[in-house]
């Protein structure tokens, strides 16, 4: 009996030793695992530097971003022939769109055009929704406070377009006192009416075709517009519109057109200026302008 008790004691002791051994082994495994995990979470300075060097750097400037994405996005308002409009296949056309393509080609990227309300283009440029604004923008000190301008690519006079038969009726500032004179919303023409015709009532709409219809229907005395656009409106009106004999002075209304670019992008401005200086010097912009006038006329725009 004593032998049996002795055997039981030895057996129980072995069980305790085995349990202690297994517990120690498990604890060691857990500690080892934790140690490995901590080591993986905290790379050395050399490893950290190597990882940072391997990560591609984000494009810093707008010019670099354009080249990285492989396209330049241009905002315009495509109802302003001959500068920007759409052809019969709904493709963007006009001398401004031709200029946009020259800029894209110079950058070695594709051109993407976004059609939007004219008064939304500058905010879109500022926010980065589009890269450039090309929509016959007049270079003014007020706008230059918000965005940067390229060099001028065209200078044009301003016309007063009236209903056929009213060319002499509305030929002086006095003849327009108290009458509505139209312009596209957000344009320099709106400012011109307020400054040069302070006793007339400014009438604004989003689109020039709608303004032309208001003139034809006799709802407004006339509309103020760039010379090329005004001549195109008259040519496509089937005799319903004509150019008034009213004239603005050169100080009032000799406006130059520029490309709109967000502030702080001098390198992109330089590229755009290089293109503008080339196409204005070699006559290719004038050729594109003449072709745009012909195309717009053939489309009745």
Predicted feature residues:
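Bacterial lipoprotein signal-peptidase II cleavage site
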Residues: 31-44
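Ligand-binding clefts/hinges and TM-proximal coupling segments of bilobed small-molecule sensing domains
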Residues: 39, 55-58, 188-205, 242-248, ...
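Extracytoplasmic small-molecule ligand-binding "clamshell" domains
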Residues: 45, 57-136
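Extended ligand-binding regions for polar small-molecule ligands
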Residues: 46-52, 97-106, 180, 185-187, ...
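Acidic, polar ligand-binding/catalytic clefts
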Residues: 101, 105, 110-175, 248-250
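Short helix-initiation/N-cap motifs at beta->coil->alpha
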Residues: 112-123, 168, 203-217, 228
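A ligand-binding cleft/hinge motif common to bilobed small-molecule-binding domains
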Residues: 120, 137-145, 192-195, 216-217, ...
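Periplasmic-binding protein-like
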Residues: 155-162, 235-274, 296-301
């Amino acid at each position: 009996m004593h032998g049996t008790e002795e055997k039981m004691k030895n057996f129980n002791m072995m069980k305790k030793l085995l349990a202690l051994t297994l517990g120690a082994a498990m604890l060691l495994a857990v500690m080892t695992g934790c140690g490995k995990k901590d080591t993986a979470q905290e790379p050395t300075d050399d490893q950290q530097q190597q990882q940072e060097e391997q990560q591609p750097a984000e494009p810093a400037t707008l010019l670099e971003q354009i080249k990285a994405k492989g396209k330049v996005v241009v905002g315009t308002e495509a109802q302003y022939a001959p500068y920007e409009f759409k052809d019969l296949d709904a493709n963007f056309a006009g001398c401004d769109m031709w200029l946009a393509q020259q800029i894209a080609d110079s950058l070695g990227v594709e051109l993407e055009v976004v059609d939007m309300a004219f008064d939304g283009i500058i905010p879109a440029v500022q926010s980065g929704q589009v890269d450039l604004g090309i929509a016959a923008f007049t270079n003014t000190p007020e706008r230059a406070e918000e965005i940067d301008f390229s060099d001028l690519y065209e200078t044009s006079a301003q016309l007063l377009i009236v209903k056929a038969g009213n060319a002499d009726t509305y030929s002086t500032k006095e003849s327009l006192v108290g009458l509505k004179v139209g312009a596209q919303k957000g344009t320099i023409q709106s400012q011109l009416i307020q400054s040069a015709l302070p006793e007339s009532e400014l009438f604004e709409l989003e689109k020039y075709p709608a303004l032309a219809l208001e003139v034809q229907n006799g709802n407004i005395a006339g509309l103020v517009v760039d010379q090329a656009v005004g001549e195109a409106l008259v040519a496509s009106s089937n005799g319903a519109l004509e150019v008034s004999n009213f004239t603005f002075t050169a100080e009032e209304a000799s406006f130059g057109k520029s490309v709109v670019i967000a502030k702080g992008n001098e390198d992109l401005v330089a590229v755009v200026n290089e293109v503008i200086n080339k196409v204005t010097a070699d006559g290719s912009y004038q050729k594109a302008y003449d072709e745009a006038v012909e195309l717009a006329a053939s489309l009745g725009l």
